[in-house]
Amino acid sequence: MLIGISPVRISFAGGGTDLPEFYEKYEGSVVATTISQYTYVMIQERSDNAFQAFSPDFQKHYKATKFNKIEIEDGTEIASSVIKYLKYKKGINIVLCSDAPTGSGLGTSGALTVNLVNLIYNLQGLKNSKKNIAETAFKIGHDVLNWPIGKQDEYISSYGGLNFIKFKKNKIQVIPIKMEKNVTKELQNNLLLFFLGATRNSSTILSQQVKNIKEKNNKTIESLEQVNKLSKKMFRVLKKSNIDEFGDLLDEGWNAKKRFSEGVTNNKINKIYDLALQNGAVGGKLTGAGGGGHLLFYCKPTKKKNLIKKLTNIGLSHVPLKFTNQGPQVLNLYDTIGGSTK
C-alpha cells in the first residue's frame, strides 16, 4: 500500500494570470507557497482487475469491474480520470481525502491530482520531474475533466515551498524565493488565515474570466495585467528579505482581483474585509478564484489577537498557518511496518 501526501497552497499575488488563455498572449506570474494542510491518497493493488475509488470528503464510492468500464462521476472524478489518462489497467483501490475542503480556495483539487499522478508513477516504477507531474495533473483537470483552470495549483503543489512562477507561452519557470530565515518566520507570523465557513464552485467564476479574456474584455485584461505587475513587484520585495510592503501589495492585488469578473466577491466578503482593515489588518485577499473559501490577512503582531477575536466573533474560523518546503511525498506502508506486499 502506498500513501501519498501533497500540500495545498496559498497564492499571494498573480492569481488568474496562470490561465493559459491569458498568459499565452499577455504573460503571467504568481507568488505562492505551500502550507501545512495536505491532501492524502492511499492506493492498494488488487488481485483482480477491478477499479475502486472512495472519497470520504464527498461520501462517494465508485467501482468498475475493469479498466475499459471506468466512468467519470462526481466525487471520484479525480481518481477515475487519472487512471484513465495514465492508462493504468491493473486492479486498484484508491482513497482520496484532504485537510482543506474542495472549493475552499487553497487549490485542493490540483493538489489531489498531483498527489495521485505522483503515486501512480511511483507504482509503475517511473521517475518523473516536478514539471512533468504538474503538467500531467493540469492536463487531466483541464483536458479530461474540462475544468476552466490555470496551472498554479499543480505547479505549486508539485514543487513545494515559496516560489515565484513565470508563465509564458511554451515556457514556465519556477524560481524559489529565498529569504533570511528570521524574515520568513516574521512573514509567516504576520499572516492570518480565516475560513468563511462555506465553500464555492470556482468553475463558474473562472469560466466567466476565461470568457472575458477570449472576448478581450478591457476591464478583465487590464486587471490581470495589473496583478501580474504586482506579482513581479512582490517577488522583487521578498527576494530582498523586505516585507514592509507586503500588506499593501496584498490589498492592491485584492482590489484589482475584484474587477476580474462578477462573483469574485460579494457584500458579506466586502464587509468582513473592511472590518479586518478597521481592526489591524494592513491588507489581505480572498484565496482562490473568489466567491468564498478563505480570507488571508497581513497583520502586525500587536494587532493579531484583536483581529482574531473580531473575526471569530462573527463566525469565521481561524486556521493556523505554516509554510512548508516539500512537494508530494510517498510512503510505502509495508516498508514502514516491515511487512511484505505479497
Question: Where do the protein language model's features map onto the residues?
Answer:
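C-terminal nucleotide
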Residues: 1-13, 17-24, 30-32, 40-88, ...
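Short gly/ser-rich anion-binding loops that grip negatively charged ligand groups
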Residues: 65-73, 103-110, 127
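Conserved catalytic cysteine-centered active-site region
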Residues: 88-95
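Short pre-catalytic strand/loop immediately N-terminal to key active-site residues, enriched for Gly-Thr
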Residues: 98-104, 282
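DPxDG-like acidic metal-binding loop motif
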Residues: 106-126, 130
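Glycine-rich active-site/cofactor-binding loop and its immediate structural neighborhood
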Residues: 292-294
